[in-house]
Amino acid sequence: EKIDPRQYPYIIENKRLTFVGEGWKSGLWSIMQFDPETHFVLPNTGDNLGWRPYDATEVKPGLVRLADPKREANKRFPAPGTILVLRHSTRDHAGIFIYHSTDTKLENLKLFHTCGLGILSQYSKNIAFNDVHIIPNAAKGRVLSGHDDGFHFMGCSGLLKIENCSWAGLMDDPINIHGTCSRIMEVLSPTRIKCKFMQDMSEGMEWGRPDEMIGFIEHNTMRTVATGKMNKFEALNKAEFIIELSAPLPAGVEAGYVIENLTCTPDAEIRNCHFGSCRARGLLVSTPGKVVIENNIFESSGSAILIAGDANAWYESGAVKDVLIRNNDFRYPCNSSIYQFCEAVISIDPEIPTPEQKYPYHRNIRIVDNTFHLFDYPILFARSVDGLTFSDNTLIRDTIYQPYHYRKEGITLEACKSVVISNNKIEGDVLGRTVKFDRMKSSDIKISKNPFFRKLK
């Protein structure tokens, strides 16, 4: 196969493959490998950066040779027949943008390609997607459907209802639901604080509106120490803004703390969807609203479900308080490649520099009545959760691929409490038999009606 220079014009510049367009050019910065039969991301490839030290030479028009000049970096080369997606350019614009809207419904849609996020929703209330698919155009033989996330929700409220949807071939997560933390840079007066968007992809947003509630967070422990109400929002530039509070700043809150919008926090229902093989994870959810995830099929390359939240890197806020993960089918290739936060098939992985068990970040997560097809050890990873249930699930050994993950425990717990693991059914020689825990006591874990799992300090 060759690069079609009519569809994808390119040049070789300084021994680098560079794609060109009208008024722009962009060098190759990532390569994804897809199975030619299943169109799954090939296992244990993911964000493999070993190919980056390369020299490009044109063998003939459309045929480019990429060679490691030192013959050192690549320990694994793509097999003949592998489909390569050559990633270049930057996140451009969303295919569909929903902004400051109410009661929006999309249905019976297919998006074959977007140059950025598939559907971006911001500061909108009550959104319903039914029978919406972001998938490659099979008629053209494509495996790529989008540059970034599929459905991306930031700062929304009301109910997000997603049913009968599917995704495949995305270069990021099919669904991401979150808010945005911003840092307090300066206390200007008892009622005025100067804040900053710490992630450049958040810059330019309207962080909040009058009468919306604010949480004040100590970023090392991610503990919400106080709340307040916003009276006025004033943008200074794309990155910085001033918030006027309706009452004096709570005692102890100072520069370096972060703020979270507690009003723009939706409920979410995600049912009967197919999370096909995409780069990275399947479903990311960070909202304190009620969340139901049920009757879905997951075939993600990384973790199927990520529950994160942080004020230290991505600044995506939303400590969960009520999450039900029920009757889903987690299939290969779930967690078959390593990406950020992919600690297990289900990864509850908030970025907390110093997690303290007495200040849990997430609460009330139930993982029940699901089926896991497992070729590797890690099933569940959880940090800083109060009230975690893993019960009545069916765990089935799958030998489609060899174990590779650095974690060798089935369940890993850190700074959690009130954990229940019970009545899980085992089929075959499932590998992850141990429960590893840290920053917590053995008595914080209750294992019953199942001799399979055993505790390991």
Protein language model features and the residues they cover:
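Short glycine/acidic-rich loop motifs that flank beta-strands on beta-rich extracellular proteins
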Residues: 93-94, 115-120, 137-149, 171-177, ...
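Long amphipathic alpha-helical scaffold regions
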Residues: 124-159, 188-202, 295-334, 395-420, ...
